[in-house]
Design a protein with these regions (language model features):
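Extracellular loop-to-transmembrane helix junctions
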Residues: 55-105, 109-115, 130-157, 264-270
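C-terminal membrane-solvent junction of multi-pass transporters and transport-like membrane proteins
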Residues: 209, 348-359, 395-432, 437-440, ...
């Protein structure tokens, strides 16, 4: 592999760890003690801000109304119990994934399932932003000198969680279990101590620095509903366990249901306990210190023997709030992978990374959350208004889907199970309506607008993928049945240098009957190249000098347009490039060549063979040419590349496929045999789901003899605009990988999807 590309790979190994094989996926499954901190940290940690969120709203009616926070919290706790009971049934019915998207898709249809998916994706991003910002607030509440760095600290926390999650599910579980359990213990101690003091003597009184101003309004039904909606943020995170059933150890459904039960017990106890103490200690919302911090300081006052417990509570509140974001880092990538599998978003989201996690989903979630934190300056009170809409939309659709499931299947106990899910659907629907009405003008409108826009995008992506799949499948037979292909080769000549010598050798190898040499006189090119050309090549072919006024790309295209092109007529443009060093930046400096390659890529029947050569690293003169076609399957794009390979008439020509599993290897062997393409197929396994390493090892085995050069032909789908992001990520990776690989030349065989 090129030295220019080694440092990023080494850095990835340091931060992410050694890659794991697909066969190790079973080892990554989680027991309940590890699953709880991974999937339930969000719901458990919400005790740190849900009570305060309700109190901020109640403050609008004056200080005297803050006591209403306790009955509101009890109502939220009842709602949480209903939702968790409903989800315990859901995970038993859908043992691989009981998330809202799957349940709604199977029982309510495509549109409701996409509404649930879009709402959840938005909510997962908001969960990261709110949790991390709340965690940083817990620290700056204790160390007030840091309160000017909330945004920077929050962004750093997002980066840390991202790296940990890229290292794998099980490793993140071990990392996050310790602080999560210590938070639960410290909060139980704080709640127990506070309740004991209130029951046996006078309740301690909280001190509130920089309190928020109290309003003078009346405590009407609208304000009560708004406060209830804010407190309902305590329910966020419950969905993640249902989405992640397949991450549990077997029996998966049973273990997921047990984890939900533990979550209900812990979260309800802590939430109601904190609300009780917040009311009894007269804590009130502050611009600098959280309500939980005030309660902890009141229960463990400075100077007392237990004052150190205040710092324990603060430190682990910070830790669990930061780690609560991890719930989204489990849910978002899994949901994205399901959507990608159904072709509603880019297929890259289905790719497992080195550590058997959906790495693309992890990175996208981190980027979106970081952007929100930066825009809102890590202000929890501003972010919280965007919260909850998405999760309660998903709750409602999931529970409604389960009602339909029981009525449709009549499974065991359906007569009493359906009403449980029905009550859950009704309760969460009421909360969703309340949230939309009460928080619409404060930011919820953005979520309401974002969800339909996302759904439009989902349908657009699916239409594109379905059309491409149909075209590739239908076109495969026509490509295979095409008559024997012919090839015309053109070599672009800028100067007489070692890169040109390699290009001429390749042109003679793929067009022994002759080829054309074109020179476009441009600023910086060799003005005296024509008389020296004859002696350099021994007379043939003649150098054709084009009109330099058109520019390189237009002059070459004008010649290409004059040649026959089609399924059986190809034009190969060989482009020599001489570099001073193995640097990706050095290629970017060749703007004219890049523009030419980009223009030629959209021309039907035109193949660009890029021949990069590093000055001073030439090696032995090549003697043998081998052709290898990288194929993804039996489709029109791969078969066109095979047709082109046969037109080159190189004796040692083969197709190569890198399979991520033995099942995939068997499947492509069967497909290849049934379609009987004109060249043999070799299949190599890539157990780490990255074809880079296996591809390099395969090529190194061929080029171990320095007289051999391998021409790698790579099918590449060509489309326009934003659709480019839906294709060819692997092709771009291979281009970077092989750019400076010794004795390897890469040529793209385009398949146009421009309409």
């Amino acid at each position: 592999m090129s030295e220019a590309l080694q440092p990023p790979r080494r850095a990835r190994r340091v931060f992410v760890g050694r890659p794991m094989t697909s066969g190790q996926l079973e080892d990554e499954l989680l027991p309940i003690p590890l699953a709880l901190p991974i999937f339930a940290a969000d719901a458990i940690s919400s005790v740190a801000y849900a009570t305060e969120a309700a109190m901020v709203v109640l403050l609008g009616a004056g200080l005297a109304e803050l006591h209403v926070a306790l009955p509101l919290s009890i109502a939220v706790a009842v709602l949480m119990a209903i939702v968790i009971a409903s989800y315990r049934q859901t995970v038993r019915a859908y043992e691989t994934s009981g998330g809202a998207y799957i349940v709604a898709r199977e029982n309510l249809g495509t549109l409701p399932s996409l509404v649930a998916a879009a709402a959840l994706l938005v909510d997962y991003v908001l969960t990261v932003a709110v949790s991390v910002s709340s965690g940083v607030l817990a620290i700056t509440s204790a160390v007030t000198s840091l309160d000017h760095y909330n945004t920077e600290l929050s962004l750093g926390a997002v980066l840390l969680i991202t790296v940990v999650n890229l290292r794998g599910v099980r490793e993140s579980g071990f990392t996050f279990a310790f602080p999560t359990y210590l938070f639960i213990i410290s909060m139980l101690v704080a709640v127990g101590t506070g309740v004991f003091k209130c029951a046996t003597s006078t309740c301690p009184r909280a001190v509130t620095p920089h309190p928020l101003a109290a309003g003078a309004g009346a405590l009407g039904i609208f304000l009560l509903l708004k406060a209830f909606a804010s407190g309902a943020s305590a329910l966020t995170g419950v969905e993640a366990i249902a989405n992640g059933v397949n991450a549990f150890k077997h029996p998966q459904a049973k273990n997921a249901a047990r984890t939900l039960g533990v979550l209900a017990l812990v979260a309800i106890t802590l939430f109601v306990g904190v609300s009780y103490l917040a009311v009894r200690t007269h804590a009130r919302p502050s611009s600098t210190v959280s309500v939980v911090s005030q309660v902890a300081r009141a229960v463990f006052p400075a100077g007392s023997a237990a004052s150190w417990m205040f710092w324990v509570v603060q430190i682990f509140t910070f830790a669990v709030l930061i780690l609560a974001a991890n719930t989204s880092f489990q849910g978002f990538p899994r949901l994205s992978a399901l959507l990608a599998h159904d072709r509603f978003i880019a297929r890259q989201f289905t790719n497992l990374g080195d550590r058997l996690v959906f790495s693309n989903g992890v990175v996208v979630l981190a980027g979106a959350a970081a952007l929100l934190i930066w825009i809102y300056h890590a202000n929890v009170n501003n972010l919280i208004h965007l919260y909850v809409v998405g999760v309660f939309t998903a709750f409602t659709l999931s529970q409604a889907g389960m009602v339909r499931y029981w009525l449709r299947t009549h499974g065991d106990g359906w007569r009493w199970r359906a009403p449980i899910n029905g009550v859950g659907a009704l309760a969460t629907f009421v909360v969703m309506v309340v949230v939309v009405v009460t928080k619409f003008t404060e930011g919820a409108w953005m979520v309401i607008v974002a969800v339909p826009l996302m759904i439009v995008g989902f349908y657009g992506v699916r239409r594109h993928y379905v059309r491409v799949a149909r075209r590739l499948e239908a076109g495969a037979a026509a490509v295979v049945a095409a008559p024997p292909a012919r090839n015309t080769t053109i070599v672009i000549v800028e100067s007489l240098d070692p890169a040109l010598d390699r290009a001429l050798w390749l042109a003679r190898g793929i067009s022994p009957a002759g080829f054309r040499a074109l020179h476009v006189p441009l600023p910086g090119s060799d003005p005296g190249i024509r008389p020296r050309w004859f002696h350099h090549v021994g007379g043939e072919p003649m150098l054709e000098v084009l009109d330099g006024g058109l520019g390189l790309a237009e002059a070459v295209l004008e010649q290409v347009w004059r040649l026959p092109r089609g399924e059986s007529d190809f034009v190969t443009v060989v482009l020599p490039e001489l570099f001073e060093s193995e640097s990706l930046l050095s290629q970017a400096r060749n703007a004219r060549e890049l523009a030419l390659k980009f223009r030629l890529l959209s021309e039907p029947g035109v193949i660009v063979a890029d021949v990069p050569t590093v000055r001073g690293r030439l090696g032995a003169a090549p003697q043998r040419l081998l052709v290898r076609v990288l194929v993804s399957g039996v489709n029109a794009a791969s078969m066109r590349a095979v047709n082109y390979a046969t037109a080159l008439d190189v004796a040692d020509t083969r197709a190569v496929h890198f399979a991520f599993s033995s099942q995939e290897a068997r499947a492509i062997h069967v497909d290849w045999s049934s379609h009987a393409p004109r060249i043999p197929l070799e299949v190599d396994e890539a157990p780490y789901r990255d074809i880079g390493g296996p591809l390099l090892r395969y090529l190194h085995a061929l080029t171990v003899d320095e007289d051999a050069v391998v021409l790698v032909l790579m099918p590449e789908l060509v489309t326009r605009g934003l659709r480019r992001a839906l294709h060819n990520q692997r092709a771009l990776y291979i281009k970077r990988l092989l750019l400076f690989e010794p004795r390897v030349i890469l040529a793209s065989v385009p398949y146009q999807l421009l309409r």
